[in-house]
A protein has these predicted regions:
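Conserved short histidine dyad/triad with adjacent acidic residue
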Residues: 1-21, 38-40
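Sequence-specific DNA-binding recognition helix
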Residues: 150-193
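Short acidic-glycine-tyrosine-enriched beta hairpin
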Residues: 33-54
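DNA-binding recognition helix and immediately preceding turn/loop
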Residues: 87-130, 149-167
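A short hydrophobic beta-strand segment most commonly corresponding to one strand
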Residues: 47, 60-77
Length: 197
């Protein structure tokens, strides 16, 4: 399944714990960060490196919606750790894998076998904060889940409540707030029925 948009979308602040292949089926997608820009048209794909923060501008074609897919790829075994963010990327992967978990400093400390203060200090030294990372990765999980609907045999509309709960958000308003605050869009813009043809 793919994400479909009849209107231009500007998704901001996206970051996934693994490499992400973006494939455009219809319309145009521009991926960019502070260093580079990659423009994709129908049939093009590009792999965004793991844990790289990027924006995604989606532009439908004339009279046709934009259709694109997101697929996580296993990281290369000798690949780097998110630009020197070893602890943050490892935590992001844990959060993405189990977004419904209660991600607290105590849980993180137990996972890393350090004190909660030391766990927070590790994230801080990499320019990250626990709650921000949790929110970001839950949203990444929700976006990936929305893109995977029907690929896993699910049919019909992607339900906002199911995506929100499955991605660890306490409520639909919390999910909507995260979409607006982190990605800059309302979830209703990308949570819709199956892609055309």
């Amino acid at each position: 399944m793919a994400l479909v948009s009849d209107h231009p979308l500007h998704l901001l602040g996206l970051r996934f714990p693994l490499r992400l292949r973006v494939t455009v089926r219809q319309g145009f997608v521009t991926l960019h960060n502070e260093i580079t820009t990659k423009k994709l048209a129908s049939g093009d794909s590009f792999v965004v490196p793991a844990f790289l923060r990027f924006a995604c501008d989606v532009m439908p074609g004339r009279g046709k919606p934009a259709v694109f897919t997101l697929a996580l790829e296993d990281d290369e075994p000798d690949g780097g750790h998110g630009g020197g963010k070893r602890w943050s990327q490892a935590l992001a992967q844990h959060i993405f894998d189990t977004p419904q978990g209660k991600w607290t400093a105590a849980r993180l400390a137990a996972l890393w076998q350090v004190t909660p203060h030391k766990a927070r200090a590790r994230l801080f030294s990499e320019g990250e904060a626990l709650l921000s990372l949790v929110r970001e990765q839950r949203l990444a999980h929700a976006l990936h889940t929305a893109a995977q609907a029907d690929a896993d045999g699910e049919q019909g509309e992607r339900d906002l409540a199911q995506v929100a709960a499955g991605s660890g958000f306490a409520s639909i308003p919390a999910f909507c707030d995260a979409c607006v605050d982190v990605a800059g869009v309302r979830p209703s813009l990308f949570l819709r029925g199956p892609a055309p043809g």
